[in-house]
Regions:
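N-terminal, intrinsically disordered, highly charged
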Residues: 1-304
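Short pocket-lining segment of the protein kinase catalytic domain that shapes the ATP-binding cleft
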Residues: 309
Length: 309
């Protein structure tokens, strides 16, 4: 299965072709490949990405004894096969606020792609269908810069597409409400802070959704503490991971203030008091269902309250 140039006809990955290539390269036996095809034909969900299906079969990697053909290993293999760079998507290294405006959520979902970097020279797009090019010319024309392609894990592309665009929508919604109100105090009142301590749903406020994302993301990244720091132009959220602080998102200043107020409410702190340091505690659930208690501390600064969790 040779790599295709962008001028070649588009071709979706085919399970039969991929298994044949894995057999020819010594990763699988022919018997195992045929067994996989039989299972696939009888499967209810035939829409699963071929690499995800192969990985789900927990097959032994004959070229690396003792190792399974896991999804990430298969993604690296596919990138080499397509002669495109491989990328393991690290959300800590992606400027979500910069990449989400590059295309609509519908466009990203339709083509199963995700923008992962942008600079003055190019836009880097992750895809798990390296031989499909139909979206490239339209996107390059709209963005007025070349497209640099990378191959990434299809599961990660789907998960982070949903996560990044949901966060961007919440930030945009919260900021637009603030701009309509035109003042910080009314913005915080509108949020009805503390009114939704239950599990967030689609009807919750934008700020509640952002705070919920913040907790989930911190647990996913195994952050030891979270810093929310106001600035004149942009507030920032930073996670400490393995002793190093990483900036994970920058919010408009008014949104940063509202996030801090939401957290103060959850921690049973005095929302109205902004000139004195305060301490509080909040209990929340980890993604695996465990309960954890977070300590909250606020400190007044020239641009609002800084919070450390």
């Amino acid at each position: 299965m040779p790599a295709h140039a962008s001028s070649a006809p588009d071709r979706l990955l085919d399970l039969n072709d991929l298994l044949r290539e894995l057999v020819s390269q010594g990763y699988l036996t022919q018997a195992t490949a045929e067994q996989c095809l039989t299972i696939r034909r009888s499967a209810v969900n035939n829409q699963q990405h071929p690499l995800e299906f192969i990985a789900s079969q927990q097959l032994d990697d004959l070229r690396h004894p003792g190792r399974k053909l896991e999804l990430e290993h298969l993604t690296v293999w596919l990138a080499a096969l397509a002669n495109q760079p491989y990328l393991r998507i690290d959300p800590l290294k992606i400027d979500v606020a910069a990449v989400t405006p590059l295309m609509s959520y519908a466009f990203a979902q339709r083509h199963k792609i995700l923008a992962v970097a942008v600079d003055k020279d190019a836009v880097t797009i992750a895809s798990a269908q390296p031989f499909v090019h139909k979206w490239e010319s339209d996107l390059a024309h709209v963005l007025k810069r070349p497209i640099k392609r990378v191959v990434a894990n299809p599961g990660d592309i789907q998960r982070f597409t949903v996560e990044f665009f949901r966060l961007a929508k919440s930030v945009s919604g919260a900021n637009s409400i603030d701009q309509k109100l035109g003042n910080f105090g009314n913005f915080e009142q509108l949020l009805k802070l503390g009114a939704s301590d239950q599990e967030p749903d689609a009807n919750d406020s934008h700020i509640v959704n952002i705070v919920d994302w913040l907790f989930q993301y911190a647990f996913q990244q195994r952050a030891s503490d979270i810093h929310i720091e106001p600035r004149r132009e942009q507030g920032s959220v930073r996670f400490r991971i393995d002793g190093v602080l990483h900036t994970v998102y920058q919010f408009p200043p008014q949104v940063t203030m509202a996030i801090v107020s939401r957290l103060k409410s959850l921690g049973r702190m005095n929302i109205a008091e902004k000139r004195k340091p305060q301490d509080g505690r909040v209990k929340t659930k980890t993604p695996d269902g465990g309960e954890v208690e977070l300590r909250l501390s606020t400190l007044p600064t020239a641009f609002g309250e800084k919070m450390v969790m």
